[in-house]
A protein has these predicted regions:
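Rossmann-like dinucleotide/phosphate-binding beta-alpha-beta segment
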Residues: 1-92
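Rossmann-like dinucleotide-binding domain for NAD(H)/NADP(H)
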Residues: 84, 93-182
Length: 182
């Protein structure tokens, strides 16, 4: 059983906001080439900081990437964005990672692509509620499932608590909290 080195791989980040940029920062250290698809192209100074290449067309980006990382919010535009047609564009030796929302990927198509080895593997921090699909995903040797545990660290939870306190204080002071939900 042989693995593959990560140095020199191409990473396509879907959603280059705060989390996407944090991933780009870490990936760059490993010599990974950073590419991204986003609602809007980032300012040139941010692109230069990550040596990132913008792709307006999602399909054109996906078909050239070794790794695709989904980090965008779930909206009407992103729901189902990673369709069977997009998955079919991926290379057979490529991997897809979803740490965003399960509804962004057509999970039935993803299961088929993984079973047929049209995609090398998947890392899913989120997945749908359909029991049959979860069972199929769990039984795939080329898939890793962790139930939305990306922030399940002591430091992460302390940081979340501190943000809550800052947001409450900001609201009480009559200002708009940074992480407002409604």
């Amino acid at each position: 059983m042989l693995g593959s080195r990560i140095h020199g791989k191409r990473l396509g980040i879907i959603g280059m906001g705060r989390i996407g940029q944090a991933i780009a920062k870490r990936a760059k250290v490993f010599g990974i080439s950073i590419h991204y698809h986003n609602r809007n192209q980032l300012p040139s100074q941010i692109e230069e900081a990550y040596e990132a290449t913008y792709w307006k067309n999602l399909g054109e980006m996906v078909k050239r990437m070794d790794i695709v990382s989904i980090n965008c919010p779930l909206t009407e535009k992103t729901k189902g964005m990673i369709s069977e047609n997009i998955l079919k564009l991926m290379m057979p030796n490529s991997y897809i990672i979803n740490s965003s929302r399960s509804e962004i990927i057509d999970e039935k198509a993803l299961v088929r692509m993984l079973q047929e080895k049209k995609i090398a593997g998947a890392g899913l921090d989120v997945f749908g509620a359909e029991k049959k699909l979860k069972t199929e995903l769990l039984n795939l040797p080329n898939t890793i499932l962790i139930p939305h545990m990306g922030s399940a660290t002591v430091e992460g939870r302390i940081e979340m608590g501190e943000k809550v306190i800052v947001n409450i204080k900001t609201f009480i002071d009559g200002h708009n909290p940074q992480n407002r939900i409604i």
